[in-house]
């Protein structure tokens, strides 16, 4: 969850495309769905999706391993599986950290002024 407590949904993304691009609401929703479907299809095939200045979505294979049942302590085999990971770009990391620093500095300035 974000610091503001807001979670951005598909509907929010569609509305942003509608407001900023000028497509109709129907076209905006179709556009967002198409982009998400394309990303999903690529990941299903095991392809990496790299979005410049944003980050990369990748599928990694996890091998079989032994886990433990936390209640009983007995060992349980965990089947091999594929997991999706997201690696943010350096630009995105910097923007997130600078944004957090700016908010923190703004709060400090408000407290000092108050």
Curated annotation (Swiss-Prot):
Coiled coil: none annotated. InterPro entries: Hist_DNA-bd (IPR000119), Histone-like_DNA-bd_CS (IPR020816), IHF-like_DNA-bd_dom_sf (IPR010992), IHF_alpha (IPR005684). Keywords: DNA recombination, DNA-binding, Transcription, Transcription regulation, Translation regulation. It holds the Pfam family Bac_DNA_binding. Belongs to the bacterial histone-like protein family. This is Integration host factor subunit alpha. One of its GO terms (biological process) is DNA recombination. HAMAP family: IHF_alpha. GO terms for molecular function: DNA binding; structural constituent of chromatin. Heterodimer of an alpha and a beta chain. GO terms for cellular component: cytosol. This protein is one of the two subunits of integration host factor, a specific DNA-binding protein that functions in genetic recombination as well as in transcriptional and translational control.
